[in-house]
Amino acid sequence: MGKYMRKAKVVVSGEVVAAAVMELAAAPLGVRTRARSLALQKRQGGEYLELRSRRLEKLPPPPPPPPRRRATAAAATADATAAESAEAEVSFGGENVLELEAMERNTRETTPCSLIRDPDTISTPGSTTRRSHSSSHCKVQTPVRHNIIPASAELEAFFAAEEQRQRQAFIDKYNFDPVNDCPLPGRFEWVKLD
């Protein structure tokens, strides 16, 4: 901020002080704002964009790269139809940018047959409702999972050993039998509350 301000020289004679004040009034105060720079640009009449203190001239867009050549006849017909569609899109006008890479693509993305569980459930857009049972479909055998719930006797036998171990650890630590709800002789003295 200091470089935009000028100090007035204080001299005994009134003439020097007045000259300094007149000089300050003639110079623009403050920073150049966007409005001031636009007004200066209109007065100067230049064909450029002014960003901060640099001038940037707008260049025309680069020409599109030439299309690639293909060896097959099918690719040549695909190029011809792509060129016709490109001409049709260009004729509408506007600033639409054509994606040449997308037009030159001649393969489709597919899901591998090993990842499809049931190929009969997948329908392609525009296909009929008739199912085609061709040998080209990959049949993946999925294992059949049955939810077998063990009997309650098996569950009791499975958890009984761990429950017994936890019960014995509690009895040893607190000298209290939680199953029978009675204190046992040991290091703690149990008192029944009212």
Swiss-Prot record:
Query: What GO terms in the biological process aspect are recorded for it?
Result: regulation of cell cycle
Induction record = Down-regulated by cytokinin.
Cite the residue spans of the region called Disordered: 49-70, 107-139
Q: Please provide, alphabetically and separated by semicolons, the GO molecular function terms listed in this UniProt record.
A: cyclin-dependent protein serine/threonine kinase inhibitor activity
Q: Name one Pfam family in it.
A: CDI
Bias kind Basic and acidic residues: ranges: 49-58
| Single GO cellular component term | nucleus
* UniProt keyword terms in alphabetical order: Protein kinase inhibitor
Q: Does the record carry Ribosomal protein as a key word?
A: no
Q: Which family does it belong to?
A: Belongs to the CDI family. ICK/KRP subfamily.
- Name it: Cyclin-dependent kinase inhibitor 4
Species of the source: Oryza sativa subsp. japonica (Rice)
Gene that specifies this protein? KRP4
